[in-house]
UniProtKB/Swiss-Prot annotation:
A Pfam short name: KRAP_IP3R_bind
Ranges of compositional bias, category Polar residues: 443-453, 465-476, 669-678
SMART domains noted in UniProt: KRAP_IP3R_bind
GO molecular function: signaling receptor binding
Protein name in UniProt: Protein ITPRID1
Biased composition (Low complexity): 477-486
Region (Disordered): 223-290, 442-486, 624-678
Coiled coil regions in record: 843-902
């Protein structure tokens, strides 16, 4: 049908032109609503225009879809396409089929992807119509710039604040703790801080690079500076050879004159010395640098110039022995040395045929020369072997120092120097090839008659240590500003003295042989040992001790060499110092020493005890340290740590506690053996348990016992104290870990039992509830054992399941606080019952009333606490709830113990009553004349009369009534049996005893039962009074 319509069109060309005009017209109308030119009023006035514009836009969109290539690919005839679209539009079929597409087109029109001037209108502004498919594709191609802009390319990324709606930024947040502005500022700072630049994150590499460069430049600068100084001196010598040569010649002549003058005077008095000194010229000394031009002169001087150097060497060796003698008149110097010109090193470099000597050849030559003259070194007992090699980067000494070895003249001191010949440096870089093994210096033994050594830069040593100081004065100083001198105290002595000390020479020869077996070293004949080291250098890399001379005046050196390893850790391991120490040990105290550090960097070691070590090493009084790590094995039962409190109460010594190591039972009871403790009775709650432990040490000491009664843990409402009691072993020093129990001392048994010292109160601690008969005195002492306790012995012999007062069982570490409270209150109960022996019936009645009132007060407190806890159950933390539970346990235990105490008071009153009645019955059965001696008592008088009667009969000694003896203490819940006949039991059947089990299980019934029974049955007393009156009438 479509094909027929296309074929039926007569005027194709006219239709094409009309279609083109319609497309342009429709395009203008389609862009009009998108640009917003049409107002709502115009749309309401012209509804037909609006409908027409919508239809045209639909048609235009369909036309674009058709022109995109779908229909053109089927039929390339443009006229057919136009006719086909016109027929479809006329039939009105498009409106129902492309509804969804139009909706998407409307959404597309809201986002202007195409501009009217560039994309859409420009397509229709062309003069001609595309005739091919590539032209159509180019004609309908969208602008790539527009597409990229729509996708987000090419535009600046919007700030994060633009993505937040303005209503959130304009008003503050209603939520608490949130501030939008602060949040945004923090985010901005975070973005600024987190710089993606990796260079900022790895600035440490740059710092390390700077540090490395600084060290490298420092090392290079030191080497370069030394080289520059040397080159400068050489240039000056070359430029002005006459002046420099004259100065050097003058200086050498002055030195040689001094040496020659001393040589003549000393060799005249000691001919053997000159013979021994003649062998020293054969020991050469080579510079450090083997390629130095002066090497050839040094090697050649061994064979050719030995005779010329002999006076100089002899003069240097003679200085060692007779440097303290007065200087004699000058003698003519040897002309061979004075007239001999000393060429410069630069001249030698030109004249020497062996300038380019290899390093290996020089070393082999040095070793060969040294091994050839080793036998001569054995005969020189005064030569000091070389110390540690120098680790600094220094050039070799000048020519005259290498050959002549000038002496460093100091009053009484001969300096020693070590040349760089045997240095372990292979080049001038300053780094070692291998670390040389350190060798102890050897010093010949001196006689005790010589004066003490005065070291350079050191104070004179004590006169008492002068013999040892002569050998130990050789010390090394590290870190000095200039070249540090290692001074030797080899004083002048005769050759005969050296021969007498043959044993010392043998030991030294052996040590020298051992030293020679190590890496070879060449020793200068003039014994000058100049030790150079950089300032601040810390020679920690040197293995072994530095120097240790352990010898006294009667022993040769090397005897105490074994102590070197014992002391090397102490000599080196001193914090805060960058220097190694040289120690001196003596036989009298090899473990105790003191180190003094004077300002001149020399370290003196004296055999005294330092303040920091005398407490942990040696105790002169007790011969035993008071610290834990120094105690013997028998103190292993003590605690590993001691935490002092209140003025170091637990830090004691063996002398202050004489019975510390004695077993329990052997502790002296003498009051003079009390320890010098300062006891304070007002202790905090966390120290009460610790005081109980410490009180074990003061057992049986009169007047020094702590007031640590078993009721002390109850002086606070904080029940965490009971958990601290289980940890008391870590805070107190004690002899045995027994729990602190209450028991009477010997004085208590002699003078009778004492009343209760303190009463218990939950809220006030220890209130002074003073009732009739109460006496606040010193409580019974705390004890560890009861070997001498007659009360405990009587208890162990008596039958019954009652618990003992003096217990030895240890509280378990995991013991429940409730059980611990029960045990403590049980001890309180036993103590109270024991102290009731001296109480009267009226006092016991008063105490019973106090117990009842206290029980009522405790119930009121409990109700108050429960009400407070019910009001704030949610606000309580876990710790507060736990504390409340502990308080409840405490109140329950107190209530139970108060009920038990009330029962015991009533029981004791009944016992007193039965005892009185028994005494009355026995007196009534005796003869009437005995009854006449009875005092006249009015039994119906009341309480005061009862009290006087009871007191009268309580003092009468009787074996059946041990309550008056003061030696018997009833057990908790234990009823004392009395001898009563069946008739008496029948007449007094109203009196019944209640067991403590019933009292503990039910405190309420026990109190009610006690309340029902009075302390003294008035009817029973009336019967007794009637009997007495009848007997008196008879």
């Amino acid at each position: 049908m479509i094909m027929e319509e296309l074929q039926g069109s007569d005027t194709p060309r006219a239709g094409l032109e009309m279609s083109k005009r319609d497309i342009l017209r429709h395009t203008k109308r389609a862009w009009a609503p998108l640009d917003g030119h049409l107002l709502p009023d115009s749309e309401e006035e012209n509804p037909m225009v609006t409908m027409y514009v919508q239809e045209n836009s639909k048609q235009e969109s369909i036309q674009q879809w058709l022109d995109s290539g779908f229909f053109v690919s089927v039929n390339e005839n443009f006229q057919q396409t136009i006719n086909h679209t016109a027929s479809l539009h006329e039939q009105g079929i498009i409106q129902m089929t492309v509804k969804d597409y139009m909706r998407s087109l409307h959404q597309f029109s809201e986002t202007p992807t195409l501009s009217r001037g560039t994309s859409f209108n420009s397509c229709y502004s062309t003069t001609g119509v595309p005739q091919s498919i590539p032209e159509w594709l180019e004609f309908w191609e969208k602008d790539p710039v527009e597409i990229l802009l729509d996708l987000g390319f090419g535009a600046d990324e919007p700030d994060i604040c633009t993505q937040i709606p303005a209503r959130f930024l304009g008003y503050s947040s209603a939520a608490r703790g949130i501030n939008i502005h602060v949040f945004l500022e923090a985010q901005k700072q975070r973005m600024d801080f987190e710089n993606p630049d990796l260079y900022g994150r790895f600035q440490q590499l740059e710092i390390l690079d700077h540090v490395t460069n600084a060290f490298s430049s420092l090392l290079d600068g030191v080497k370069t500076q030394q080289n520059q100084h040397e080159e400068k001196a050489e240039r000056q010598a070359m430029q002005n050879p006459s002046s420099s040569g004259a100065k050097e010649h003058k200086r050498k002549m002055s030195q040689l004159l001094k040496r020659a003058s001393r040589q003549t005077s000393r060799m005249d008095g000691n001919p053997a010395l000159s013979k021994s000194c003649k062998t020293e010229h054969e020991i050469p000394t080579l510079p450090t640098k083997p390629w130095d031009p002066r090497v050839e002169l040094q090697v050649a001087s061994i064979s050719h110039d030995a005779s010329q150097m002999l006076p100089l060497i002899e003069c240097g060796s003679a200085q060692v022995h007779n440097d303290l003698s007065p200087c004699p008149p000058l003698c003519p110097p040897p002309h061979a040395l004075l007239d001999k010109p000393w060429p410069c090193s630069c001249t030698l470099a030109k004249q020497s045929p062996h300038t380019c000597l290899s390093e290996g050849s020089v070393r082999r030559r040095n070793w060969k020369e040294k091994w050839n003259h080793m036998d001569r070194l054995k005969n020189l007992s005064h030569i000091v072997s070389k110390g540690p090699d120098s680790f600094e980067m220094e050039e070799v000494q000048s020519f005259e120092e290498d050959t002549g070895n000038p002496l460093i003249l100091t009053s009484g001191i001969v300096g020693t120097r070590v040349d760089r010949t045997n240095s372990c440096q292979s080049d001038s870089s300053g780094f070692l090839e291998e670390l040389p093994e350190l060798q102890p210096l050897q010093v010949s033994s001196m006689t005790g008659s010589q004066s003490p050594t005065v070291c350079r830069g050191c104070k004179p040593r004590d006169q008492s240590h002068s013999p040892a100081s002569q050998q130990d004065s050789l010390q090394e100083s590290y870190g000095s500003k200039s070249k540090s001198m290692t001074s030797s105290s080899l004083l002048s002595q005769d050759w005969s003295t050296l021969e007498e000390n043959a044993s010392a020479s043998v030991v030294e020869e052996e040590l020298q042989l051992k030293a020679m077996e190590e890496p070879p070293e060449i020793v200068n004949p003039d014994m000058t040992l100049i030790k150079t080291i950089m300032v601040g250098e810390h020679p920690e890399s040197v293995a072994g001790p530095v120097v240790t001379s352990t010898s006294t005046c009667n022993n040769t050196m090397g005897v105490l060499v074994t102590h070197v390893t014992e002391k090397e850790d102490r000599s080196v391991g001193h914090k805060g110092t960058r220097k190694m120490l040289i120690q001196r040990h003596h036989f009298e105290s090899p473990r105790s020493f003191r180190i003094d550090q004077p300002s001149d960097n020399f370290y003196h070691v004296d055999s005294e005890i330092t303040k920091t070590e005398d407490n942990c090493k040696v105790c002169p009084d007790t011969k035993q340290s008071s610290l834990v790590q120094e105690r013997p094995a028998q103190h292993s039962h003590q605690h590993r740590g001691a935490m002092p409190y209140k003025g170091d109460l637990v830090q004691t010594s063996e002398k202050s506690i004489p019975h510390l190591d004695k077993p329990p039972g052997h502790v002296p009871t003498d009051s003079n053996a009390a320890s010098s403790w300062s006891v304070t009775t007002q202790m905090s709650s966390n120290l009460v348990s610790a005081a109980q432990r410490v009180a074990d040490l003061g057992t049986y000491n009169k007047g020094t016992a702590f007031e640590c009664t078993p009721c002390d843990p109850l002086n606070t409402t904080d029940l965490k104290l009971q958990t601290e009691t289980r940890q008391v072993k870590d805070v107190a020093v004690q002899t045995y870990a027994h729990e602190c129990k209450l028991r009477p001392s010997h004085n208590d048994f002699i003078h009778g039992p004492r009343p209760l010292a303190k009463s218990i109160s939950l809220d006030t601690g220890f209130p002074s509830i003073s009732a009739t008969g109460f006496c606040h005195t010193i409580p019974a002492h705390c004890c560890v054992c009861c070997h001498h306790c007659p009360n405990c012995q009587w208890r162990r012999q008596s039958p019954g399941p009652e618990p003992s007062i003096c217990r030895h069982s240890l509280y378990s570490q995991a013991e429940d606080p409730k059980v611990q409270f029960m045990k403590t209150l049980k001890i309180l109960q036993d103590t109270t019952v024991r102290d009731l022996c001296s109480c009267t019936v009226y006092e016991m009645e008063t105490m019973k009333m106090v117990c009842q009132s206290f029980r009522e007060h405790l119930e009121e407190i409990e109700q108050h606490f429960m009400g407070q806890q019910a009001l704030y159950p949610r606000d309580m933390s876990e710790e507060e709830r736990e504390e409340a539970e502990y308080l409840r346990t405490l109140r329950e235990a107190l209530r139970q113990q108060v009920a038990e105490l009330a029962f015991q008071l009533g029981d004791r009153a009944r016992q007193i009553k039965e005892g009185i009645l028994l005494q009355l019955d026995l007196l009534c059965e005796e003869l009437p004349e005995h009854c006449d001696n009875l005092p006249q008592c009015n039994w119906t008088e009341g309480k005061h009369g009862q009290r006087s009667c009871v007191q009268t009969h309580a003092v009468a000694p009787d074996p059946t009534l041990p309550a008056s003896s003061g030696q018997w203490t009833p057990c908790s819940g234990m009823t004392q049996p009395v001898a009563l006949s069946p008739s008496h039991l029948e007449t007094r059947g109203g009196i019944s005893l209640q067991s403590p089990a019933r009292a503990e299980s039910g405190p309420g019934p026990s109190l009610s039962h006690v309340g029902e029974k009075s302390l003294l049955d008035q009817s029973g007393f009336d019967d007794l009074c009637t009997k007495c009156n009848v007997q008196e009438q008879l």
